[in-house]
Design a protein with these regions (language model features):
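Acidic interaction surfaces
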Residues: 1-125
Length: 125
């Protein structure tokens, strides 16, 4: 099933494009919050009315239109979705995705080097 994502922010970092976006969350807040600690009825009312946003966060690391890495975090509950950009939530996912993206760049660099070598050899014969 395809999910539609709403972009929260995008920016350049270390030669990559970082895209932070969100989509609706499949799981119920009841699976993440305890009735003894939270007023679940009020929470559901706040989500339904739009006072709270219940979503899954995604971070993608791109070069041009190529996705090198992505990380996801479900069960996000915020009054203002943009708070994920300043409270460390998105930064944690960005850091994880950047590590993966840098590994992927190195892997692809080596692969393209091998392909280039093969093509150079073919042209020399």
């Amino acid at each position: 099933m395809t999910k539609n994502y709403e972009e929260i922010d995008s920016f350049e970092r270390a030669g990559f494009t970082v895209i932070v976006d969100k989509t609706w969350e499949d799981i119920s807040p009841r699976d993440c919050f305890d009735d003894e600690c939270w007023d679940m009825k009020q929470m559901f009312e706040d989500i339904e009315s739009g006072r709270l946003d219940w979503f899954m966060l995604r971070v993608r690391i791109m070069v041009d239109e190529y996705e090198l890495a992505s990380e996801y975090l479900g069960g996000c509950l915020y009054e203002n979705v943009r708070d994920v950009l300043t409270d460390g939530t998105a930064e944690d996912l960005i850091a994880q995705a950047m590590v993966t993206a840098k590994r992927e760049v190195y892997r692809m660099y080596k692969k393209f080097q091998d392909i280039s070598w093969e093509h150079d050899c073919e042209g020399a014969v």
